[in-house]
Amino acid sequence: MKHIFMNMAVVGLFSLGLASCSDELNISSIDPQSKTTYDDMELLAKQYATLGLTGQAGPAGKPDISADEGETGFYRTTFNLQELCSDECIWAWQNDNDIPALTNISWTAASDRVNWAYQRLAYDITLFNQYLSETETREGDDYKKYRAEVRFLRALHYWYFLDLFHKAPFKLVYNPEVLPEEKAGVDLYNWLDQELTEIEPELAEVGAFNNKANFGRADRGAAYALHARLALNSEVYTDGQKKEYQKAIDYCDKILVDNAGKYELCREAKNGYSGYQQVFMGDNDYNEQAMKEIIFPIRQDGKKTEAYAGSTYLISSMRVSGMPYAGTSEMWSCNFARKALATRFLDIENNNEANNLAKMLSETKEYKKAYEAYTNGKTFANAGAASDPTKMTEAEVIAADEALGGSTKNIIRIANDERALLYAGVGGGFRTLTTDQISGFTNGLSVVKWQNSRSDNSTPSDGKFSDTDIPLFRLAEIYLTRAEAKYRLNGTQDLEDINELRNRAHATPVSAVNLAVLLNEWGKEFYMEGRRRSDLVRFEKFAGNKYIWDFKGGVSKGTSVDKHFNVYPIPSKDTSNNPNMHQNPKY
């Protein structure tokens, strides 16, 4: 991110002069307010910076929220509430604060991680309200667009409130003396629908910011994408009062038909990286093919946006020392794939190669037996490597993975799908497909979808913090949204939209559409992108007993959980301090 807009974001961060609002958050309702003065365009950039930064002094030192700063960023908090409770991943270290509550779907109104997400959303909205209040009298077309962009960011945050909590502490003005009101369900849905409709014509035209100078700003494409997502979930958000699937289709068509060609799927392989891989790499803000797919990103730069809550979190938490092609010096060994995610790609019941790989991964002793048979008679650079893969060099690990079948390349081949970016190799230790007891990072396969390496093979800007922008909205979502909305509206078999994505991944095209096919496709295309819980709720597969996955409900083989867990509780800190906010049922 060597561009003007991101440089401004960093300057704007400090121009605000905000002290941390943490003390106020701890003692009063979650409505952080501080007196500030604005410095024009830099402050617009600051509004965007809230998506990727966590405070005013790099990764730590002057946090926005009073907690572990790396844990309380916008994307990390919302990602955790969407993914750690789902069928996709497990946090290896179950003794960490509040982690079991997410793993097992057993959170309460006192859960810290629920509170952190709630605080972050409320804090950011206050900044947006402040900007809008102080620029209300500014004139000119530029300010009209700037204000529309900030209104979009505010709407995005209220969407997260609706999706996660089914209600929000709602306020549209900057006034420290007034507590937020509660707006829930259909009322919040209707407000979002109206707000997006109002700001769409005031935003820059579709694709206007899909260039290196302005990448990361919201144009109409971003608003249309959010509007389509809102409408697709209308039945859930309004408790069945609305089913606006035609509206979802219409907003997809505004991108795919009315503005055809403004965005394109990243298809062409480059230096051995598939088109799909390139969307999640460290140069996805320079690689024009990857940029073309991304409708709205969270900007990240290893030098200019140091934080532990953005793509650095996604990359570092999913790697352990010893894994090949790491692309980072930060390897935290935290998030690994649940069996349900691995078998989404590896059909162990019907594919002999997948079944054979699963047998080797069934127990550590089985993998070790195969490993020692491979290393027998070979010479290695370091003593002990013949029995302990953590003592291998990277080149030796790569060779062993190719021979034993645990490489990502081999998993892609077996899955017949380039989206199967999983690693079952020996880098960092012997992995298993699943476990009866969560004890460490190698209890499952590793997810290598997110990476800081670059498709042009150039060096990342920093060895510790990631350059990889986070595609918050990308064109693939529009294809799948339209396909699902058509099916839910009248049973239309929209094979073309689904197969656009499968063809890009060189996967076998589908020949029929049903809800199971649609959910499976969402899972293969968007795993570990911070949305899985939402999709499972929409398909009635999250709470209840219609779908059971490993460690759901705190049991290794999984069990049913009560349906009140489909939404998160309002943090007790807020219900205690704001009489306008009421707790969700059964919390």
Where are these regions (language model features)?
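Membrane-proximal, proline-rich intrinsically disordered regions
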Residues: 21-75, 577-587
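Long, intrinsically disordered, low-complexity segments
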Residues: 20-27, 40, 121-122, 185, ...
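Conserved, well-structured interaction surfaces
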Residues: 41, 45, 49-54, 89-165, ...
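Short coil/turn linking the two alpha-helices of tandem helical-hairpin repeats
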Residues: 162-164, 169, 207, 233-240, ...
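Short, surface-exposed recognition loops and adjoining beta-strand edges that mediate ligand/DNA contacts
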Residues: 31-38, 58-82, 204-221, 236-322, ...
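Flexible, polar/acidic helix-loop-strand segments at domain edges
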Residues: 99-106, 116, 343-474
